[in-house]
Amino acid sequence: MTARRIDGKAIAQKIHADISLRSHAFLRQWGRSPGLAVVLVGADPASRIYVQKKRETCASVGIASFSANLPADTNPQQLLAHIGELNVNDAVDGILVQLPLPPHFDPEEIIEAIAVEKDVDGFHPYNIGRLALRAPLLRSCTPAGIMTLLQESGIDIKGKEAVIVGASNIVGRPMALELLLAGATVTVCHRFTRDLAAHVGRAELLVAAAGKPGLISGAWIREGAVVIDVGINRLPDGRVTGDVDFAGAEQRAAWITPVPGGVGPMTVATLLQNTLIAAEHRMGAPHV
């Protein structure tokens, strides 16, 4: 068996086309474009690249982007004050603070300072809580993007054994809530999990989000499983790889996402979707 590759780039382009139509309709109706503010603290090269890509993608779908590049020695009070200004700026519908932040920041404090209706990353405790209560509003971008990948690929997960490797607040935990909402039976594996291989081996749907290159051996994968690899790990030789041994897993799985080109494009597409939803809601549409 050779797995079918799930093309995240192609599915993301389909979403971009829909966003473009809706954002231009928004402009015609309200006289302005939906607006996304991206805040970067420091000069981390990878973060700068991500921010630039987000700006370019915003421009391609008719979303206005506002960038603030703050120096690395910005203190928490200064960043909180800037977020406060964005919270009341009527041109801004969504706010994203690029992570990771420098070590002198408490990320949770910063995330909680963002107005819940502008939390387009979907990280605010209010939005995570709504998802837990089966009434999601603005959803965490990577988990929601994965759900779209599955839906667009015609993969039904209701009743399936789903295993998530990684329990972060950004991916693992909200991913578990998304899968529960969709009717899967969910196991979350973490650093204290015993016999990871056994858990992976029973997964009909595997979501790997540990941030450790090659953590999951292809030999562990259940025959016919769906493998979603969230990991984006840069190796010393410059190559980018996921958390799963792709070559081995591809011979056992039915479906698999490549790295890069699988989950990553969907995360950005969902961010833009959230920005549009937030904009429409702020102008009275019954999305959230």
Swiss-Prot record:
This is Bifunctional protein FolD. NCBIfam families: PRK10792.1, PRK14186.1. Its EC number is 1.5.1.5, 3.5.4.9. GO terms for molecular function: methenyltetrahydrofolate cyclohydrolase activity; methylenetetrahydrofolate dehydrogenase (NADP+) activity. It catalyses: (6R)-5,10-methylene-5,6,7,8-tetrahydrofolate + NADP(+) = (6R)-5,10-methenyltetrahydrofolate + NADPH; (6R)-5,10-methenyltetrahydrofolate + H2O = (6R)-10-formyltetrahydrofolate + H(+). One of its GO terms (biological process) is purine nucleotide biosynthetic process. Homodimer. Belongs to the tetrahydrofolate dehydrogenase/cyclohydrolase family. Catalyzes the oxidation of 5,10-methylenetetrahydrofolate to 5,10-methenyltetrahydrofolate and then the hydrolysis of 5,10-methenyltetrahydrofolate to 10-formyltetrahydrofolate. Pathway: One-carbon metabolism; tetrahydrofolate interconversion. It holds the Pfam family THF_DHG_CYH_C. The keyword Oxidoreductase applies. Keywords: Amino-acid biosynthesis, Histidine biosynthesis, Hydrolase, Methionine biosynthesis, Multifunctional enzyme, NADP, One-carbon metabolism, Oxidoreductase, Purine biosynthesis. One of its GO terms (cellular component) is cytosol. It comes from Acidithiobacillus ferrooxidans (strain ATCC 23270 / DSM 14882 / CIP 104768 / NCIMB 8455). NADP(+) binds at G166, A167, S168, I232. It comes from the Bacteria. The gene is folD.
